[in-house]
Amino acid sequence: MKLHKEFQFVYKKGKNQHSSNVVLFFLPQNGIRKVGFTATKKIGNAVKRNRAKRRLRALFCQYSDTLIDGTYIFVAKQSIVESSFEHIHLDFKKILTKANTFKDKLL
């Protein structure tokens, strides 16, 4: 996802889940899977923002086969800079579970 209006549509119409490091905005859509990753300037300079987005992309790739179709937007919070990858991973899985985005409810 790259268009501002796509992001705004999901922000307004989708449901959201918060954790200490990540915010998920999710809009279920059949047959369509779009993903966006954002990090505000509150996080820090471009290096820190890009690192946060790379971490979120890596986590999404791990779970992408087990998720239902829809539009996902992951917003990195300021605390992601100091957090370990393991802690971010736990937060990531927790918000995906709370948002009921897994195909299999056993995960």
Q: Predicted regions span which residues?
A:
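Positively charged, solvent-exposed patches that mediate nucleic-acid binding
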Residues: 1-107
